[in-house]
Regions:
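Conserved glycine-rich Rossmann-like NAD(P)H-binding loop of the short-chain dehydrogenase/reductase
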Residues: 40
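Asp-based, Mg2+/Mn2+-dependent phosphohydrolase catalytic module
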Residues: 1-11, 16-37, 46-70, 77-282
């Protein structure tokens, strides 16, 4: 493998599981940073803000700051500013309040100061864009049906990702991609995807680090949206056998990863770091 100057890393299922560090992940990231490689944590997580994610990770011992983290919401905000400036947007998302990462996005259901208004007040508002984030309790029938109605009235459909599921301590859990398929079919509208696997997401990560695609490596547990999508963008892909990894998904994938390792703890050796590593990257 040619020498790399930067590493893009998915968080959930690669560094952590249910926000708890996976074995060896903290030490591996410290070693990578200590070797002087650039690091960007790239995640489709929509349940937490960048600041919240950074707080959890640093509390667990990971050497990261909020500036190291690129999330689907932050990329979505940039996408909307470029393609839908000033649009009135309805957000369908579960988890923490992520408005601080949606800088410049005008959301229904909030006044000019950002305070909550009547949660049902946006039903009859002319919505320009429906934004689909991550699944959870907020993905109830009423919320989905309201989004369906807004799409029927001409709103654009923008989704932060297409993830069908993610893994927690309780096993695989449904994610918003499963519901997005239904919205697309019912409304006869194809979603514009802003997070992984969109090329724009990886381009934003490379720009954030100031490196070319050939100088970077992407590590993920989702073969299609993390690894193969990165490879299409010219980035070397590494699949880990943790998180949502399933052998059957690996076998049925549309392509092959450049590299497969058991876990993120194996990455320093793959990069040629440490005493037990190869003398040169192959």
């Amino acid at each position: 493998m040619a020498e790399k100057h930067a590493v893009l890393v998915d968080i959930d299922g690669v560094l952590t599981l249910s926000w708890k560090p996976l074995p060896g992940a903290v030490e591996a990231l410290r070693e990578i940073r200590g070797a002087g490689l650039g690091v960007a944590l790239v995640t489709n997580t929509t349940s937490r803000t960048r600041a919240s994610i950074a707080g959890v990770l640093t509390g667990a011992g990971f050497p990261v700051t909020a500036d190291d983290i690129l999330t689907a919401p932050t990329v979505t905000a940039a996408y909307l500013a470029r393609h839908c400036p000033g649009a009135c947007c309805a957000l369908l998302n579960s988890g923490d309040d992520i408005r601080e990462d949606l800088t410049g996005v005008r959301l229904t259901g909030y006044d000019d100061t950002g305070s909550d208004t009547d949660p049902g007040a946006d039903i009859d508002v002319d919505v320009d864009v429906v934004i689909v984030g991550g699944a959870g309790p907020g993905f109830d029938y009423a919320a989905l049906n309201r989004a369906f109605g807004q799409l029927q009235h001409g709103a654009r459909l923008v989704a932060m990702h297409r993830n069908l599921y993610w893994r927690t301590d309780d096993g695989l859990q449904l994610d918003s991609g499963a519901f997005l398929v239904g919205l697309e079919r019912a409304a006869r509208r194809e979603a514009e995807i802003t997070g992984k696997p969109s090329a724009a997401f990886f381009e934003a990560a490379l720009a954030h680090l100031g490196v070319a695609a050939g100088d970077a490596l992407m590590v993920g547990d989702a073969i299609e949206s993390d690894v193969l999508a990165a490879q299409r963008a010219g980035i070397t892909g590494v699949l880990v056998r943790t998180g949502k990894y399933l052998p059957e998904t690996h076998r049925a994938a549309s392509g092959s990863p450049d590299h497969v390792v058991d876990s993120f703890a194996d990455l320093p050796a793959l990069l040629g770091l440490g005493e037990g590593a190869p003398s040169a990257q192959q």
